[in-house]
Amino acid sequence: AAWLLSSRHHVTVFEKETRPGGHSNTIVADCPEGPVPVDTGFIVYNERNYPNLTALFRHLDVETQASNMSFAASLETGCKRRFEYSGSGLNGIFADRRNIASLRLWRMIGEIVRLYRAAPDLALQTGLDEKPLGVFLREQGYSAALRDDHLLPMCAAIWSLPLERVEQFPALAFLRFFDNHGLMGLKGRPAWRTVKGGSREYVRKLTEAREGRIRLGAGVETVRRDETGVLVLDARGGCERFDHVVIAAHSDEALGMLGDADETERRLLGAMPYQRNIAWLHSDPAFMPDERRVWSSWNYMGGGAGSPVCVSYWMNRLQALPTERQLFVTLNPSREPESDHVVKRIEYDHPVFDMGALVAQRQLWQIQGTRRTWFCGAYFGSGFHEDGLQAGLAVAEQLGGVRRPWVVENQSGRISLPGSAVREQVV
C-alpha cells in the first residue's frame, strides 16, 4: 500500500520492528561456506495463485528460482516407531518398507484419490460454508486414515494450526482452497518458486526509494480520528497529524491501535482470533522424520491429540541453499533444539479462519475510509502473501487514485470487495 501510494502522495511508514518486511524475514546463518540467507516466514509462491506477487517481482526485477513443495507426515503411534510417509513417489510412500503391508496406508491412498476426484462436485453442495471440516469428512464416509494421517496434518501445516482447530475449519473454505491451489490434483500441480537470496531482496527493492520515510522501531501506540485528520502517537513519544491512515497490521493489532474504535470496527476487527507460533531456525535433525528417505520440504511432526502443530521446513530443499549444513525452520517443537544447533528463535502470529472470522471477513471492506482510516493485511483473504498484497493494492487505489503498474486477471480475486464476483479463494 505504501509503495503504490508513494508514487503520487507523501507517505510516512511507522514500523514497530527494527527492520521492514514483517513475515518476509530472512535470517543469515553461519555455515562452513560462509553466511547463508534463509527465509523463516514467507518462503514460496506460485504464479497461478499469486498473480500480483508475480507481477510485483517482475516489475521490481526480483530474481527467483524453482522450489520444491513435497510433503511428509511423521505421526505418533504409541509405539517406538512412528508412522511415516511422504508424497514423493513410491519410495517416499513406502520409505518405511513396513508400510507396504499397512492396510491403513492403502485405505488412505484410496480415499485420497476418491476425495480428489469428488472435490469439485462436493464444493457445490449447500451449507458447507457453515459445516466443520471434521463433520463433513465423517458424513462423507471418509476414514480416520484419510482424516488423521493426511488431510488434517496437511491443513495444520498450511495454516499453522493445531488439529483441533483444523477440524473446525469450514468445509467449503477447505475444498475451495485446496482445489484452487492444485492440491487436489493428482497431476498438473502449480510450480512453486522462491526469491533468490531470500525475501529480504524484494523487501529491499520495495523500500529502497523510500529511505527517510520509513521509521523503524516506531510502533504506533494510538490512532485518534477527527473531522480534519488523523493523530498518530508512536512508541517513541512522537505525535503527528496526517490526512489519512492505513493500518497494515494484524486485525487484532489494528483494533488495539484505535483509541476511539466504533462498534463496527470492534465487531469486525475483533472477530478474528490469532495463533501464536514459535519458529526456530536450526540444524538439529531430531525434528525431522526418522526415515531419511521421508524427508520433504514440509514435514508434519505429529505429537498426538492436544499438541500444538509442529512442522519442520527443510530449507535446503525449499531454497536450494548453497551449503552442506542442513537447515530447518521448525514451528512449535515439543522441546527446544539443542543450543549448538540454534540459529534464531522467532515468534509469528497467524490468523485463524473459523466461521465467525469468515463472516466478519466478508464485511471488512465496509469500514474502509471511515473517519479517514483504512485497513489491509493478509487477514482480508487466506492469510498468505498474495492476500495481503491484494488488500494493500486495493486500498492504495481506492484511497489515492493510483493504479498498480500491471494488469492481471481477477486482480482482487482473493479478497471480498463490494460488488465483486464470488472470490476465487474463500480461504
Predicted feature descriptions by range:
Residues S6-D30:
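Glycine-rich FAD pyrophosphate-binding loop
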Residues E33, G78-K80, A235-G237:
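Glycine-centered tight beta-turn/hairpin loop motif at sheet-sheet or coil-to-beta transitions
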Residues I27-L53:
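N-terminal glycine-rich dinucleotide-binding loop that anchors FAD/FMN and/or NAD(P) in oxidoreductases
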Residues V28, S86-G89, V294, S307-V427:
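Conserved flavin/dinucleotide-binding core of flavoenzymes
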Residues A218-H350:
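Mid-domain catalytic core of redox enzymes
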Residues E47-A171, L175-R176:
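Mobile amphipathic helical/loop "lid" adjacent to a hydrophobic cofactor/ligand pocket
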Residues H9-T12, T64, V245:
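Hydrophobic anchor at the start of a short beta-strand
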Residues F174-A235, E240-D243:
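Helical element adjacent to the flavin cofactor pocket in flavoenzyme catalytic cores
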